Amino acid sequence: MAPNLRKSHPLLKMINNSLIDLPTPSNISAWWNFGSLLGICLATQILTGLLLAMHYTADTTLAFSSVTHTCRNVQYGWLIRNLHANGASFFFICIYLHIGRGLYYGSYLYKETWNTGILLLLTLMATAFVGYVLPWGQMSFWGATVITNLFSAIPYIGQTIVEWAWGGFSVDNPTLTRFFALHFLLPFVIAGLTLIHLTFLHESGSNNPLGLVSNCDKIPFHPYFSLKDILGFMLMFLSLTTLALFSPNLLGDPENFTPANPLVTPPHIKPEWYFLFAYAILRSIPNKLGGVLALAASVLMMFLSPLLHKSKQRTMAFRPLSQLLFWTLVANLFILTWVGSQPVEHPFIIIGQLASFTYFTILLILLPITGALENKMLNY
């Protein structure tokens, strides 16, 4: 009998072992769909981004006009731009749900997979930030100014780093051209990191909702989960096209319809919605360096998750106290996101400070203590 090409060809064999004959736990739920959705998001963003880059000019005098030209005069340029801008939002929705799943079901105990995942999140955040600057609207310009300025809080070398990043003494043409170069490059870095992420994942196999070893009950990825993933793709594309066609500017800032002007500061400088939780944490500390450290800690703290796992059970499926804390954390993140979008005045300042304090307390103190407490309760 002739050998099956899918199982013998060096390249096809790798694809087969990753996407076709991959042994998969039979009980993984829809929460395990977001990894493949993130892959589709990345492919969509690279494709639409490439088409946009063909019509974009990375120059301060022409950037805004070139984006306008794309939307008005290029065939379906408006659609490509709307899909790209809103695709970024869906990318972040998927990655936040993917991380939430990891925290809830103890997936962070696969340390290498988890750590590469955090690196992926950081790279995605960097990509989205430099991408937001490219249309060269008011919020693009002032967002770039404010966020890059945070590096000046680093003692001794901070100011030098900022001027080096800007390519001058303010955000200007050199900044825009290098941000375009970075925005083109970073998605391919994300693609490379994704392959590393998957390599580490396939070393151990997937976790599952029960957190039990599932070697005795695995099924092939195709056709079962390939079909399930296609359903996920369809639902996501339906949501994305609905948003891009019916309300493309829902998540954007009206300020960005005004070309960048260094002489006029917008009344409220705020990032896109997916950074608001971190922005609220940054603003809640009335000291520049302290705020920057809190901002960095809000994401980098996830590297500690595997070390702070004190429970004898892997997932939160049978741990009601930890579940309560987890959903409190989710609600807290919604509050932080809302506060980040509000002006810096009386009720919002204190709400932001309390929510920031709660965020760190739950992750660093309450979850490990609760895990240890639940271990004690197992004895009774």
Swiss-Prot record:
Binding site for heme b b566: H98, H197
GO molecular function: metal ion binding; ubiquinol-cytochrome-c reductase activity
Cofactor binding summary note: Binds 2 heme b groups non-covalently.
Primary localisation category: mitochondrion
Keywords attached to this entry: Electron transport, Heme, Iron, Membrane, Metal-binding, Mitochondrion, Mitochondrion inner membrane, Respiratory chain, Transmembrane, Transmembrane helix, Transport, Ubiquinone
One Gene Ontology biological process: mitochondrial electron transport, ubiquinol to cytochrome c
Top-level lineage group: Eukaryota
Residues annotated to bind a ubiquinone: H202
Cofactor(s) it depends on: heme b
Residue numbers binding heme b b562: H84, H183
Function per UniProt: Component of the ubiquinol-cytochrome c reductase complex (complex III or cytochrome b-c1 complex) that is part of the mitochondrial respiratory chain. The b-c1 complex mediates electron transfer from ubiquinol to cytochrome c. Contributes to the generation of a proton gradient across the mitochondrial membrane that is then used for ATP synthesis.
Note: Heme 1 (or BL or b562) is low-potential and absorbs at about 562 nm, and heme 2 (or BH or b566) is high-potential and absorbs at about 566 nm.
Subunit organization: The cytochrome bc1 complex contains 11 subunits: 3 respiratory subunits (MT-CYB, CYC1 and UQCRFS1), 2 core proteins (UQCRC1 and UQCRC2) and 6 low-molecular weight proteins (UQCRH/QCR6, UQCRB/QCR7, UQCRQ/QCR8, UQCR10/QCR9, UQCR11/QCR10 and a cleavage product of UQCRFS1). This cytochrome bc1 complex then forms a dimer.
Protein name (database record): Cytochrome b
Species name: Pelagodroma marina
